[in-house]
Design a protein with these regions (language model features):
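Accessory alpha/beta interaction modules
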Residues: 1-152, 162
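Short, charged alpha-helical interaction segments and adjacent helix-coil junctions
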Residues: 1-7, 15, 74-79, 166-266
């Protein structure tokens, strides 16, 4: 059977998203479309950034990590499944960003500003907004007590219809929903060509092979832990089910990707 490259291997797949937006001009365009008021003109981009999270004793891989000349940190993550605890997931990524937001010897008031941005192909909160942004209140009963934590938790809804967004962001959200269309902008056509080039490359095959190995290792570990705890089936979900959400994110995200990508080979 001939593979339909446009069906499963879309821009919402983590490695594909990270690769396409590893190019500074693509990353800059995306950030400008999401945060036009910041006037971002340049930045250092690190796709699929690996950070060692000592608390969990494992490496954590970020989809798209960027820092501008003012020291602001931007972490953009594709979220393709509904989450039981989105707030915990934001907190988890925030804890990782905080590792880079204050250098040793700096005062607390020098802590960098961070933007954790989740992009969803569905409406995560069901209110129809294009963009949801969280706020921290020092007094839950007083909406005027918003704390300036220098953190921004932003959820972008590809299915949104309420609120104002840039035309560039709307183009990108339409691309997530519909793929390439006759109305797609030149930028969307460009990143779609880069997506196709990537999934036809040896680099993509190597990346997918690494994910397949990761899945195999996770299944083996799950079976081992499942036997130890007397579970009937030692599948990956069985292993992860009894742990905190913060301990799920790093590997489970990619395990899920491999499963979806494997379907595209059928």
């Amino acid at each position: 059977m001939v593979r339909n490259e446009n069906h499963n291997l879309t821009i919402t797949r983590d490695p594909i998203f990270g690769h396409v937006f590893s190019k500074p001009e693509n990353c800059l365009h995306l950030l400008q479309s999401i945060l036009p008021d910041l006037g971002i003109t340049e930045g250092e981009v690190t796709p699929q950034k690996q950070l060692n999270k000592k608390l969990l004793e494992k490496n954590v891989i970020m989809d798209l990590w960027a820092k501008n000349k003012d020291g602001k940190i931007f972490d953009v993550e594709m979220q393709t499944t509904k989450q039981k605890w989105p707030g915990v997931r934001f907190r988890y990524y925030q804890s990782i960003a905080d590792q880079d937001s204050l250098k040793p010897g700096e005062d607390l008031d020098q802590i960098g500003e961070t933007y954790i941005i989740f992009i969803y192909p569905f409406d995560p909160f069901g209110e129809g907004k294009y963009i949801y942004e969280g706020a921290f209140l020092l007094d839950k009963d007083n909406p005027d007590s918003q704390a300036n934590t220098k953190t921004h938790w932003i959820s972008i809804n590809a299915r949104g219809y309420k609120g104002k967004i840039t035309s560039e962001l709307k183009d990108f959200l339409n691309y997530i929903k519909y793929g390439l269309t006759k109305d797609s902008s030149n930028f969307i056509k460009k990143i779609d060509r880069e997506r196709l080039d990537y999934i036809r490359s040896t680099e993509w095959r190597d990346a997918k092979m690494s994910l397949d190995v990761l899945l195999t290792d996770e299944r083996a570990e799950a079976r081992k832990e499942g036997r130890k705890e007397g579970r009937e089936e030692g599948i990956v979900e069985g292993k992860l089910e009894g742990k905190l959400e913060a301990q799920r994110i790093g590997v489970k995200k990619f395990v899920q990707n491999v499963r979806e990508l494997d379907q595209s080979d059928d």
